[in-house]
Structure formats: C-alpha cells, structure tokens
C-alpha cells in the first residue's frame, strides 16, 4: 500500500522494454512524473503509485491507513472506502469485540448503543449533553420524532458523523493558550471533581482552562463570567420530566430549534422560559425521545464560535490537515512521555499538602476553631475565665505556670514531710552499694601500684642484663643439643620450619598479619601517672588514634637493630617460674630461645596495667550512677511524681525485720 522508492512494484509486462533512464522511464501520480525519490503511496485497487506531496498525504499519516484508494477508483466504485488502523482496546475482551463489531464509513468501529463509556458519560453529564446522551444510548426504547432536514443539513450530518470517529487526541491544536497550559486552575467544576483536589473523580475531564479553544467540545470550553451569568454546565437546558403524551412534540421541536441554530445555541438556551432551567429531576431512557444524530453532532464539537465545524472538507476530515495533525500528535506524544512524571509530581504534591497542613495546624492553632469559638474549653488557669487555645488546656503560658506553681506549693511540703518520717529502703541500698564500690576501687588502686612497681623492676632487670658479658661456650653447647631433623609448622602461615628458628619466624609472621588490621579511636588516651600504654599514633585518613599496646604495635614501631656484641640477657628460671638469678649470655643475634624477650615481658606488664585501668573506669561509672540516683530520689521532680502510701498510720517504718 505504502512505501518509498524501494517499495515500488515492478512495471507491467508491456513496459519491460522501456528503460528507466531518459524519456522512456515509467511515470506515476497525477503529476505524471517519473520521480521516485520521495514518499509515495499506492492504490490498493489499480496499483497506481502517487506522490504524497501531490495528494497531501505525509508518511506519518499513511501509517494510520490500512487500505487506500485513489479518487478515480472511488468515483468508479463507491463501495471503495479508505480504511484506517485503530488502537487495540485495553479491555480484556477488546480483541474479541474488534472482529465482531460493525465498522462505519471511515473504517472505524461503530460505538454500540449500550457502550459502557457512553452510558458513563451520559450518566455523569448535565444539561443538553446528558439529555442527548441518554436519548441516544437507548434508541430502541424511545421512538424519536423525525426531524425535517434539507439535503445540505443531511450532508452536514454525515460530516459530523465522520468527525465523531476522530480520536480524542486530535482535539488539541497545540497552538492556543489552553493547549500550552500545563497546570490545572483548581477552581472550575472539572478541577473540583479531580482526586488531587479532593473530588470524587466522576466527571473525569480536563480543566476547562486547558480545553482547546479550536477543537474541544463546546460544552467543555471555558466560559468567562462576563459573557454568561451561569456556569457552562448550568447554561445548558435542564428540563423536567415531561408527561409521555403531551410534552413529546414540544420536546422534539425545542431540540429541532437547537439543531437549526447551532451557531447561537447558548444564546437561545439563556432565553428559555423558567420551566426549562428549573431544578432537574432524575431522567430515564424512556422519558426522552431524541435524535441520535443530534447527539453525535453535539459530542463531535460541531458548535464552534462561528457556527461551523472545524473540519469542512469531507475528504480531509479523516486525517486532518498535515500541519495541524503533526502538532496534535506531537502534543500527544509529549503527554505520554510525561505521564509517569506527572503521577510522581501529584504524589509529591499530595505529601507536600499534608505536611503543610500539619505545619499550619501547629504554627497557627487559632485558625482551626476560629469559626466556632464557643466550642473551645475554658482555660484551667487559677481564676481565668478565658477560652483555651486550640490543642492546649490554657489560654497562655502564664496561666499554665501559675497552676504548676500552685500545685508545687500545695503538694511539695506534704511530700517532704512523708519522706522525712519514713526511711527509704532504696536510699539504704544505695549507701551499701557505694561502700562496696569504694572497696573495689581501693583494691584496684593497690593492684595498679603493684603493676607500676613490677614495671620499674622489669626495666632494672633489662638494664642489668645488658651489662653481662658474652660467653662462647654456651653457644656451642646449644648448637650440639639441637635436633636438625625435627620440623614444626607456623601457627600463622602454616609453613614447616626448623625448631631453632621457630620463635623468630612466628614473631615476624604474626607482625606481618597483624599490621594489616587497624585498631583506633577518635580520642587519644590521657591517663595521669601512666606511661607507655597505647601507641596513640594519629591516622589522618581514618582520623583515629591507634589503640594497640605501644610495645607490640607492628604498624607504627619496629624492632631496633641489634649490635653484634650485645648479650641476650634473659633471666633464667628453674621449674618454669623460679628465678635462678642468672642471665642468658649468648649473643642476641644467635639466641633462638629468648627472641624478643624484653618486648614480651613489657607487653605482659602493660596489658595488666590496662586491665586495672579499665576496672577503675568501670567502678567510677558505677559510683556516678548510684550518686545520681540518690540525688534524684529526694529531688523536686521525684517527690512530685512518686509517693508511698502508708495504709497503717501507726507504722512509719515499712521495712521488714530482716532489713532493719
């Protein structure tokens, strides 16, 4: 049907001898030119190809055409009609109904009389739109009186029926002020019906200020208050239910007059007698005998400001003017892309409104009940007769402070007297707990002094050991006693090693793995009288202080270089714990039994000192908590909130005999 130069069908058998170059090239279209470098569309009857520019059809418009026939074929055979593609229905049974429903002259699907969408619109509308919708929704129930129409009016009705098949997205020109508007006014009847403005969402129409001024239905457009004293929905006639025998001719004549005077429909409606604009009663399908064609003309938006439909040419009506169609489709696509973002904006706007209402409620509490001041309770302040503020029991802060002061003066003396008369068991328990904490603190301080003494003794032993002389005979005896065939495995890396160098290897392997982990705190350690505890080296990247023991930190300290003539100096022991008073006099580089013995002894003493300091800190925290509880127990707030009831006034001491 459609295509460009590559989609052209081969010429007939009679043209095989013709060359495509020069004068013998095949010619196409009504212009009879051989040009094939532009968009072309082919007739599905005569297989003739036409240029889109010559017949005013663009490539985008051709995508919506299913079957296209040229004008000559349509004049020869009136049964040939251009058919268009339609979107699939979103309902589950849309595909089943599409094949069974009849199609109209333009190839579109006809709306049945019982279409639920039509019934919904007819049920929710008001005025003439609701009357016409109800009348056309059930033509089999009513017997409408035929209207006398001239041939020109009959042709006009056919045009309006074709206009009704145009998609609703084509009701936007994209140029007027209403089409360019992006926000709803929030004041018209359509906006008040929306959920985001607190409505029931029954009408489901766009804001009246956003209805296109050229293509929208006249009943949906915005009518300024200066032109009409009533709203657009109220301007349309709302007749009462007429009797079935007498009012039917008048009803059809009235609608016939509206049909003839389409251009001035609103002015004629305003001049209706008072009976036509009275309060309407519920209408049924049997009550109204209306012309379905009149309803189609009304829904298609045929009543514009000039009394003429916005599409007058019957051949251009199915696919619109190319420029206007392009703008309308562009606006539609932009709206589809912004659909999700608009939903998010609406949700965000709802949350913002809720938060704003909550803030206004607390910032301006007097606004909540300003309409009904008599419903506010009286202020509870002493001697105050004013109304309390919304959300409060008092009219001002002064009244609340006065009442609180009176309560203290009235209740506190009696509570103090009760506290002094009966001893408090919790107070006595607190005193006992304080005594126990103080004893533990004293023992911890004694332990800390002992560890300080051991610290200084160790430093003296290390200093005296360094003064010993090296003996070579002990080195030879050690080498002879070692077993070279025995192997053990490292506890850190698992490699097999010789027992002679096991301690040296394990110490270095441990330092390598330990340096991969950091232990830090945000604050340095400050302990009075304590030396050489934590490393406390600041790390600028993590902004922490290292909390390893200073003598064992492999990350920020290294073992000093040992000279060749330095003695080992490790104190020798008997039966593991009993000191002999002698020292190891092997060279420090060659002694494998006492590798880094100074560092390990210092770490042992420092670790014990740290434990004692932690114990002291815990005891200080317990003492502070107990003292705080004892202070608050007899305070103003505690006495006002808590009370011990003595059921026997003669017995003031409530303790048991065991606790006394």
Swiss-Prot record:
Compositional bias per record (Basic residues), positions renumbered to this chain: 328-338, 350-362
Organism phylogeny: Eukaryota, Metazoa, Chordata, Craniata, Vertebrata
GO terms, biological process: positive regulation of DNA-templated transcription
Signal sequence region: none
Pfam families listed in its UniProt record: CpG_bind_C (PF12269), PHD (PF00628), zf-CXXC (PF02008)
Main function: Transcriptional activator that exhibits a unique DNA binding specificity for CpG unmethylated motifs with a preference for CpGG.
Tissue specificity of this protein: Expressed in seminiferous tubules and in both germ cells and Sertoli cells. Highly expressed in spermatogonia, weakly expressed in leptonema and zygonema, and then again high expression in pachynema and diplonema, decreasing to undetectable levels in spermatids.
Keywords, in A-Z order: Acetylation, Activator, Coiled coil, DNA-binding, Isopeptide bond, Metal-binding, Nucleus, Phosphoprotein, Transcription, Transcription regulation, Ubl conjugation, Zinc, Zinc-finger
A Gene Ontology term for the protein's cellular component: nucleus
Subunit details: Component of the SET1 complex, at least composed of the catalytic subunit (SETD1A or SETD1B), WDR5, WDR82, RBBP5, ASH2L/ASH2, CXXC1/CFP1, HCFC1 and DPY30. Interacts with SETD1A. Interacts with ZNF335. Interacts with PRDM9; this interaction does not link PRDM9-activated recombination hotspot sites with DSB machinery and is not required for the hotspot recognition pathway. Interacts with histone H3K4me3.
Subcellular location: Nucleus speckle; Nucleus
Organism field: Mus musculus
Positions annotated to bind Zn(2+) 1: 173, 176, 179, 212
InterPro entries: CpG-bd_C (IPR022056), Spp1/CFP1 (IPR037869), Zinc_finger_PHD-type_CS (IPR019786), Znf_CXXC (IPR002857), Znf_FYVE_PHD (IPR011011), Znf_PHD (IPR001965), Znf_PHD-finger (IPR019787), Znf_RING/FYVE/PHD (IPR013083)
Sequence segments annotated as region (Disordered): 1-20, 91-166, 223-287, 328-375
Modified residues (Phosphothreonine): 231
Residues carrying Phosphoserine: 6, 19, 124, 228
Chain segments annotated as coiled-coil in the UniProt record: 426-479
Modified residues (N-acetylmethionine): 1
Zinc finger (CXXC-type): 164-213
Protein name listed in UniProt: CXXC-type zinc finger protein 1
Acidic residues compositional bias, start-end: 1-14
Principal subcellular localisation of the protein: nucleus
GO molecular function: cis-regulatory region sequence-specific DNA binding; histone H3K4me3 reader activity; unmethylated CpG binding; zinc ion binding
Effect of a null allele: Cxxc1 knockout male mice are fertile. In contrast Cxxc1 germ cell-specific knockout female mice are sterile.
Biased composition (Basic and acidic residues): 91-120, 339-349, 363-372
